[in-house]
Regions:
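A conserved FAD-binding loop/helix module that cradles the flavin
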Residues: 245, 461-489
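A Rossmann-like FAD-binding core segment of flavoenzymes
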Residues: 121-129, 137-172, 179-188, 257-420, ...
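FAD-site-proximal beta/loop scaffold in flavoenzymes
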Residues: 204-232, 367-373, 387-388, 392-467, ...
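Fe-S ferredoxin-like electron-transfer domains
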Residues: 1-130, 142, 183, 192, ...
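Glycine/serine-rich phosphate-binding loop and adjoining beta1-alpha1 elements at the start
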Residues: 1-54, 134-136, 140, 153, ...
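Ferredoxin-reductase
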Residues: 511-601
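Glycine-rich dinucleotide-binding loop and its adjacent helix/turn
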Residues: 26, 30-52, 169, 193-315, ...
Length: 837
């Protein structure tokens, strides 16, 4: 980072010198266009001073983070056509700037002043491009540079880019080969964070750092005009010593101020429009305690800002935050031994200046909770003395490293070989090789991981590679060192498909872009959104789900609030593969789900997926389906698939109110016998002779059916081989318990029972952000294990820790309730500008 090894004089800050050089060029008239030209024309590059002619080869780059966009740049300069995909939502830029409208190339205007591209860092559109450079690092780095990088690649006719596309879900390697790609490059980044197996390790208030950073800088919690909810209380303890821990600590302090000020502003506006009593209605004791804390802190910050302005001084916000508990980093070794210090000591220095505390040689042994089940403190053991210390902590962030992102090997067994924790490498002939580990500049860049029989190959870069994992710079270096290998293997065989690159790329718009087909209200609280997304529809299997989002740049604004959805986990109810349609169904809960009703036909959206695991469909079984409310939407396709496989289906469909029932014909098609259950009188009148009706809850209905109190029993519970429960966590837990209690005499001793676990979710890209972490406890051994619910949502009822699931579902409950009131306040203005169903 710095020169002067003798430390006898002021050292030279090399990164700042390089950045200053770039800024000097950019600030010239037409400076960006000059820089753009120099990325393609480089007289100092003897081997390739200008981009090579079109090679006819097409490369699929999976992941548009630092490794992905760097690789795309070099491959285009080598003459290849590149299609980049990313599972994250990527916001569109204006066509006049990017030269792209949807998937169509249009003329773009040159940039005269670089200032025209800049956005305030606290208000900029979180565009999604750049992967971890967008969501995983602090705003001390000017993220306006990401827009420049994006324009360098997006404006080129040899490049296409689609967000909301998950490799392994929407698109697979087999699909890519059939479509005519000559090579696939995996730039998929790091995988799931390390889980701390300690008591109360997933209590309310405990999160993975990746979950926090993604919610902050992609979902939009850090923005004053967003409706994203992410609850953070002081004091905060961050576990870990890497740069992610440093970023998490500094962002925690900054976010806390934004959070409480936004809470106070909306609370006061709602109280003025209605009353304080109406705002507080529905809050429980725990939520009232947090609300009083947030309101008191926000008012204190407001008062301090006013006093500072009157006295002509800086507001002492950091001192206040430290007084309220502040943020402490706890690391198992010395500060000087931490990865953050050895990699970038300046970040540590700045964090300490901002008021962070650093605790050395401390390892977590357990989280203590209060009577609400929320974190109140953490126990940390000194690594040398063995002494245990107790730190107050209302929030605990875990930044203890990540695992390689090798989910594909488990999704497609036999297709991707592993070598330890990483994908196995091969040379250009397809022979196994061992890459150097943790070597930012290996002697030989071994970046190939698979060679197909026809000579086409798959490569891997960045955090997923054993030589280059660890940081953004190494990820970019992997692409710079590895692209010649890709070009050589491409040159070793003729292009798979004739035709020019731009036409090839344009053909993907029709397949990968998602647009709203229509929106229909099914009940007073349930909305169906039908989306045209041909590849997402083609890949769907019963039981899977999607992530639905609208675009921030297209979302309406009301009361100064951008009506941008958080990522919604949406059940795939049905698909029409011929028309490329996917139906997803949302239960309006007061927050982002209420925005589904405002989506307009033809509106572009993100429908990432399908994701999750398909439900296991076995032939010749007797299956009992238990659906609660929205859960019935999932069971349409599952029941139909079981019946098509030759199984018998007994279906208990439960609802709170008579008005909540929908899609009756689809449910009837999915079951041999239905028992309609409703908590509300008079219940339902069956329309088929074999069906039954019951007023009460679903467990009571099962008991009554088994006893014959509802009429003739044609599919006895004694014949049931498999139970699938889908609904609220309380409903699924009740079904799980009833199997060992009231229903035990009626069921086979060794039947198989699963539930579709509705963990809170964010990225839904399988083992990335860790918001969906769910602990399991083996009923026989008592051992605890952890499952990412977005990887496999169908989990054995007897293993799920229902208490932890309920607590994690309520992590943001106060913010969600205030947001529900705020949206209700905003929507009249929004309805004036667009139609709602």
């Amino acid at each position: 980072m710095k020169s002067c090894i003798y430390q006898k004089q002021e050292p030279v800050n090399i990164p700042q010198a390089e950045t200053r050089t770039l800024k000097d060029v950019l600030e010239l008239p037409w400076g960006f266009e000059i820089y753009s030209l120099l990325t393609r024309w480089n007289p100092l590059n003897i081997r390739r001073p200008v981009p090579l002619p079109d090679s006819g080869r097409k490369v699929l780059v999976v992941g548009l983070g630092p490794a992905g966009f760097t690789l795309a740049h070099h491959l285009m300069n080598d003459g290849h056509t590149v299609l980049g995909i990313d599972g994250l939502k990527i916001e569109p830029l204006s066509p006049e700037l990017s030269g792209v409208d949807g998937a169509t190339r249009v003329p773009f205007a040159p940039v005269h002043r670089i200032e025209d591209l800049r956005e305030p860092l606290d208000a900029r559109v979180m565009a999604g491009f750049g992967g971890v450079a967008e969501y995983g690092i602090t705003v001390r780095w000017d993220k306006n540079f990401l827009k420049l990088v994006r324009l360098l690649v997006e404006r080129r006719a040899q490049f296409g880019m689609f967000g909301g596309v998950r490799f392994g879900g929407t698109l697979t390697a087999d699909d890519a080969w059939r479509m005519g790609f000559d090579h696939i490059a995996l730039c998929i980044g790091a995988g799931g964070p390390t889980v701390l197996d300690i008591p109360n390790g997933l209590a309310r208030g405990v999160r993975a750092a990746s979950d926090f950073l993604m919610a902050l800088q992609l979902t939009g919690a850090a923005k004053e005009d967003s409706i994203a909810n992410m609850q953070l209380r002081l004091p905060v303890v961050v576990i870990g010593g890497g740069l992610t821990a440093i970023d998490t600590a500094t962002e925690s302090l900054a976010y806390y101020v934004v959070q409480v000020e936004k809470f106070l502003a909306r609370y006061e506006a709602l109280a003025k429009a209605n009353s304080e009593e109406s705002v507080r209605a529905g809050w429980d004791d725990y939520e009232r305690e947090i609300a009083e804390e947030f309101l008191a802190h926000a008012r204190a910050i407001r008062q301090e800002r006013a006093q500072a302005a009157a006295q002509g001084r800086e507001a002492r916000i950091v001192e206040m935050l430290r007084h309220w508990g502040g943020v402490t980093i706890a690391y198992r070794r010395k500060l000087v031994d931490s990865p953050s210090y050895t990699l970038n000591h300046e970040e540590v220095e700045k964090a300490l200046e901002e008021g962070i505390w650093f605790g050395e040689e401390l390892s977590p042994t357990g989280v203590d909770v209060d009577h609400y089940g929320a974190a109140r403190g953490i126990r940390l053991k000194n690594a040398k003395t063995g002494t245990e210390h107790w730190f107050p902590a209302r929030t605990v962030f875990v930044a203890a490293g990540t695992q390689p992102n090798t989910v594909l090997a488990r999704e497609f067994p036999g297709s991707y070989a592993l070598d330890g924790k990483y994908f196995a490498a091969v040379d250009e002939a397809g022979n196994p090789v061992k890459p150097e580990k943790s070597a930012a500049k290996p002697a030989v860049a071994q970046v190939l991981m698979k060679r197909e029989d026809d000579g086409r190959s798959i490569s891997y870069f960045g955090d997923v590679h054993p030589s280059y994992f660890g940081n953004v710079v190494k990820a970019m270096a992997s692409a710079k060192q590895g692209y010649p290998v890709v070009s050589r293997v491409l040159a070793s065989r003729a292009p798979e498909q004739a035709g020019n690159g731009p036409d090839f790329l344009a053909s993907f718009g029709n397949r990968l872009l998602a647009t709203v087909h229509h929106v229909e209200r099914l009940t007073p609280t349930i909305v169906e959104v039908v989306v045209r997304a041909p590849l997402a529809a083609a890949r769907f299997q019963p039981g899977q789900f999607y992530r639905l989002q609208n675009f921030e740049t297209r979302a309406p604004e009301a009361q100064g609030t951008r009506l941008q959805m958080e990522g919604l986990a949406m059940t795939g109810a049905w698909v029409d593969r011929e028309k490329g349609l996917v139906s997803v169904i949302a239960l309006e809960m007061g927050g982002s789900s209420n925005l589904c009703a405002m989506l307009q036909p033809g509106e572009p959206v993100v429908l990432m997926g399908p994701t999750g695991a398909p439900t296991e469909i076995e032939p010749d079984e007797t299956v009992m389906l238990c659906g609660g409310g929205l859960g019935n939407a999932v069971l349409f396709s599952i029941g139909a698939a079981f019946r098509a496989a030759g199984s018998k289906v007994l279906y208990f469909a439960g609802y709170k109110k008579v008005q909540d029932r929908y899609k009756v014909a689809e449910i009837e098609a999915a079951a041999d016998i239905i028992v309609w259950c409703c908590d509300e009188q008079p219940g339902f009148a069956p329309t088929r002779p074999q069906d039954r009706s019951f007023v009460g809850n679903i467990v009571q209905a099962m008991d009554s059916y088994a006893e014959g109190r509802l009429g003739e029993v044609t599919i006895p519970l004694e014949e049931v081989d498999r139970i699938i429960a889908i609904g609220s966590d309380r409903m699924m837990a009740a079904v799980g318990r009833a199997r060992h209690e009231v229903l035990k005499p009626r069921l086979k001793p060794h039947h198989f029972a699963v539930g579709s676990i509705n963990s809170p979710m964010q990225c839904m890209m399988k083992e990335i952000c860790a918001q969906c972490l769910q602990p399991h406890k083996d009923p026989v051994t008592g051992e605890t294990s952890y499952v990412f619910s977005c990887f496999n949502q169908d989990q054995e009822l007897d293993k799920v820790d229902w208490k932890v699931l309920n607590e994690r579902l309520r992590q943001n409950s106060l913010g969600e309730k205030l947001t529900a009131g705020w949206l209700k306040h905003c929507l009249p203005e929004a309805r004036a500008s667009r139609d709602f169903v």
